[in-house]
């Protein structure tokens, strides 16, 4: 059965292993193909910018970052290598976060976070000591939280000294996080709970029961949280979408998908009025809706939709198509009405976005 997307995270590890085995056979017979070349000179000072992290292939140390100028439609592949020719980014670049005047590149299978200058993408330093980091969230000017696949804890990073200073015990695969005043809400794929951390004490103060394989979380204009869980067929746990009050931690609404659905990759538009998620196709749902959408917003034309993000600056949707997980991803850029604006190539398994 063709899964909606490898972003159904538990399948991502299996696919990595399958693709890695294929690559060992494939590359033993043919020479490596080079990355897609730049279509122009790097203009890091562009008015609008989109950075795309490309995971690469698991165990092949070939992750990269693509740069896209939405005004000129210029694409620069592997901007990290272009600006740092003697440094390898690492294995599986999972996500990107801007903190101050630096970008933090979370390199999952290299157990590190690589810091580059936002001015020129030049390497600054790395933070090491992680087990398998996923995302970094700045919670104050001097402190950040890092989720992790295997560590069973959240790493607390000093953003001034750029090192791990403590940990917050949290069982399971911690994934995306969102801050609401002095609370951080942490999704967890292996547990059925959304964990609540007090930023002042760096301690878990509550847990909210949600569906299995929860990974998507957004905050709407009414200051309600939305959490998307992909479910688990082996334990008959259906996918669910929860609306949660972040003040009281009460679940306000629960929307349940069918056993055939595998929704993932929850995002919200610039007005924070409409939700979008991948479920083979791309669906749109108003935050005031009383039921799940039945008609897709953007149809999959035999695409392998892998990841997406809303560009809040230009009010546009960017969607990654991972193709066969071996060749370079295709990025589709849509306006808020779902009309295609531009299609371009990024690196292998494009999954993370930063827009400004």
Where are these regions (language model features)?
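C-terminal motif of bacterial Sec signal peptides marking the signal peptidase cleavage site
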Residues: 25-28
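Predominantly soluble domains enriched in secretory-pathway, periplasmic, or organellar proteins
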Residues: 30-356
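Bacterial N-terminal signal peptides that target proteins for export
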Residues: 3-17
């Amino acid at each position: 059965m063709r899964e909606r997307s490898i972003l159904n995270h538990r399948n991502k590890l299996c696919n990595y292993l399958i693709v890695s085995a294929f690559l060992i056979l494939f590359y033993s017979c043919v020479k490596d193909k080079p990355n897609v070349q730049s279509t122009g000179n790097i203009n890091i000072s562009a008015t609008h910018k989109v950075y795309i992290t490309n995971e690469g292939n698991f165990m092949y140390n070939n992750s990269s970052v693509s740069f896209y100028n939405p005004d000129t439609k210029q694409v620069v592949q592997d901007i990290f290598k272009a600006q740092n020719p003697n440094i390898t980014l690492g294995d599986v670049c999972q996500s990107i976060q801007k903190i101050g005047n630096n970008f933090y590149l979370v390199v999952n299978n290299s157990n590190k976070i690589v810091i580059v200058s936002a001015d020129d993408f030049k390497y600054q330093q790395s933070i090491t000591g992680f087990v398998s980091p996923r995302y970094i969230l700045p919670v104050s000017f001097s402190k950040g939280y890092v989720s992790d696949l295997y560590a069973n804890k959240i790493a607390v990073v000093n953003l001034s000294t750029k090192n791990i200073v403590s940990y917050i015990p949290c069982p399971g695969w911690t994934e995306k996080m969102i801050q609401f005043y002095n609370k951080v809400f942490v999704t967890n794929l292996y547990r059925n709970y959304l964990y609540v951390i007090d930023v002042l004490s760096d301690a878990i103060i509550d847990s909210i029961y949600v569906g299995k394989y929860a990974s998507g979380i957004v905050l709407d204009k009414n200051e309600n949280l939305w959490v998307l869980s992909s479910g688990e067929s082996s334990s008959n746990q259906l996918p669910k979408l929860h609306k949660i009050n972040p003040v009281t931690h009460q679940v306000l609404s629960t929307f349940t998908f069918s056993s055939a659905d595998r929704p993932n990759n929850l995002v919200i538009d610039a007005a924070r009025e409409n939700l979008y998620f991948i479920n083979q196709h791309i669906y749109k749902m108003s935050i005031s809706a009383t039921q799940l959408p039945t008609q897709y917003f953007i149809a999959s034309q035999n695409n392998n939709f892998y990841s997406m993000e809303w560009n809040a600056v230009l009010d546009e949707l960017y969607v990654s198509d991972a193709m066969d997980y071996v060749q370079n991803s295709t990025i589709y850029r849509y306006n808020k009405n779902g009309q295609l604006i531009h299609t371009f190539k990024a690196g292998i398994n494009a999954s993370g976005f930063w827009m400004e």
